[in-house]
Amino acid sequence: MLYPELFKQLEAVRWNMETDIPWSSFDATRLTDEQATTIKMNAITEWSALPATEMFLRDNRGDSDFCAFMSIWFFEEQKHSLVLMEYLRRFHPELVPTEKELDNVRFEFDPAPPLETLMLHFCGEIRLN
């Protein structure tokens, strides 16, 4: 079982949005409208951790170790969207995604064998990086 050790490792490097980000040093005047819009689109895209997690839990129902890990993965992945939305709330509040915009990325993936589900996500992450 990998989850207990993974939990310890990930817990040790957890970051806090309020204390680990130097919000007061940000200069909103340096952000272009195009950059702010890109931040909004990324915040919406990152929100898709929710349907991805639902897919992983569904397709890996028989693997409690992996499903337990997904609880940490989802928490950390969702923070990506939240920190981008917090940035917008502070510096471009008119661009904070609406609940409807966030709901629009909640879609169902077709059921697939567990390894195919994982590869789909892994390939997507590599493509984005």
Segments (PLM) and residue ranges:
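Non-heme di-metal
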Residues: 1-129
